[in-house]
Amino acid sequence: NKKIHEKDCFNLNPATNVMNPRAEAFLSCGIGSRPSLGYPGDKYEMGLEAIEEIEVLASSLVAEIFCSKFAEIRVPSGAMANLFSFMAVCKSGDTIIGPPASIGGHVTHHNPGCAGLFGLNIIEAPIDKDYYTVDIDQLRELALKERPKLITLGGSLNLFQHPVSAVSSI
């Protein structure tokens, strides 16, 4: 896992953690510093096969210990922060606009993530394929039509700067 993420590729995922050197040495294999969004067999990032095996084994063992059918062993982090942000600004049934997965939109801003689980009406932002971001003119039109409670630019992959000032002015 460490070889894949630190030697074989240039990791562009902003969610990758930088750990305390002692914690990194303790974990030696680097598993604790990798985001692992999604369920085993259906991850959003690549190269997580070892983590998936550990998640399945750990979940099975915890479920067995507590005599349950299922156990969630993954530590909540950024997803919980996103949920709390949605809860602070919106209520169930409100509409939000966010970037689609095709330009790196974060899973927590979509139906399978906390936005959908919180009951938000999620509309994908129009995109500018040339710059891998939202199309400001089309977004402005969509926002005027839909009147969203929130427009977010949250993403898992940010290759270029997002037009934060332009979105803020909408």
Protein language model features and the residues they cover:
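Gly/Ser/Thr-rich loops at beta-strand to alpha-helix junctions
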Residues: 18, 76-80, 103, 156-160
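Catalytic PLP-binding core of fold-type I/II PLP enzymes
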Residues: 161-170
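PLP-dependent aminotransferase-class I/II
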Residues: 108-153, 158-162
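N-terminal "arm"/small-domain region of PLP-dependent enzymes with the aminotransferase-like
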Residues: 1-42
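Short catalytic-loop micro-motif centered on adjacent basic/acidic residues
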Residues: 11, 70-73, 150-154
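Conserved PLP-anchoring active-site segment centered on the Schiff-base-forming lysine
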Residues: 90-106
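Conserved N-terminal alpha-helix of the aminotransferase class I/II PLP-enzyme fold
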Residues: 35-80
